[in-house]
Amino acid sequence: MSLRYSSVLAITLLLTACADQPRSVKPVVATPHAEVPKTASVVASDEAAKTQASIADESPKPFDLTRPDIVAFIDSLSSKHAIPAEELRALLSQGMFQPKIIVAMTRPAERVLAWWEYKDRLVSNERVARGREFWNTHRDRLSTIEQKTGVDAAIIVAIIGVETNYGRNMGSWRVLDALMTLGFDYPRRAEFFRSELEHFILLAREESWDPLTVRGSYAGAMGAPQFMPSSYRRFAVDGSATASAPGRRDLFTDWDDIAASVANYFTAHRWKSGQPVLFDASVPAELLGALDRRNLELDRTLAALRASGVSFESTLPDDTRAILVPAETATGPAARIGLHNFRVITRYNRSVLYAMAVNDLAESLR
């Protein structure tokens, strides 16, 4: 889904359902200080920056199809799916290594922004206004989908709003280039992206696409809801019985398919109809300092939170599973309490910032 990595604004606009695991960060405050020797982590950071600059200076180039990892990939696909190896080589020979994608992947918005900065960009007045306009335009279909699936229409609209600003920015990278670049030259997550490349090749065959013309995010996410190829194959649905091409799933231009597919994704991940996503809380300072935004698990109960000094208003049962989520404001640390549906949203994009943004945009649209 958002893996969602160049300027902060560009990064935010290119969020996908495939975002990396977020890292805990705090707003950087400039303060006078004496110069001190660089620590190992600072040196490593400097070296990483130099490496990024070096990669960014490279030009796009074709892949060497004699590389052992690419040969193994072709052989595996050919064997598993009965696709002629020569056909696969012909396709992959047209893929291009894109160095800017590698650089972008090192700077996802979830890593470089505090919550209040992230929210300002994704829950802006303009995005709320466009969301209400979008909802009014598609009100009938959204109402039908909500009644059928139990997935809140506001959440469906918010997902599309956060992902692509209601279809305005679906990405300009060739998906083939993105997935080959990350699958063969981004070691940290190469296995994942090679799997997505496999799904993309199969999806293009299933949907009768020209794989050289499909465009998406720099992480390979596609369409208005930014589905990765594996999610497209598994969760995308034909949302209209009267579609002009029955059985085809068009997440680029068909809003019936787009809205129904987002709802289907949430249904498959056990969205609880009518239940809240999160709520605000007053949290003791010692707990705030220990929070880790990489944690996505409902690792506490509401009763345990109350017992630890967390104050909040809720009529939910004491044994309700929850997560305490860091939510920095412009004035300092803060936290919120996420519930089951919050966890479901993080299955779409593994980021607590993303899930909070979707919830807050949805609430602003009501």
Features from the language model and the residues they span:
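C-terminal motif of bacterial Sec signal peptides marking the signal peptidase cleavage site
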Residues: L14-A17
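Acidic/His-rich structured neighborhood in mature extracellular/periplasmic domains
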Residues: L113-S261
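C-terminal functional modules
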Residues: T315-R366
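Solvent-exposed loop/turn segments at secondary-structure junctions
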Residues: G95-M96, E163-G167, A221, K272, ...
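Bacterial N-terminal signal peptides that target proteins for export
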Residues: M1-V8
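Bacterial signal peptide processing site
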Residues: A19-P22
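N-terminal export signals and maturation junctions of secreted/periplasmic proteins
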Residues: E47-I74, A85-N136
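Flexible, glycine-rich surface segments
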Residues: P211, R215-L324, A330
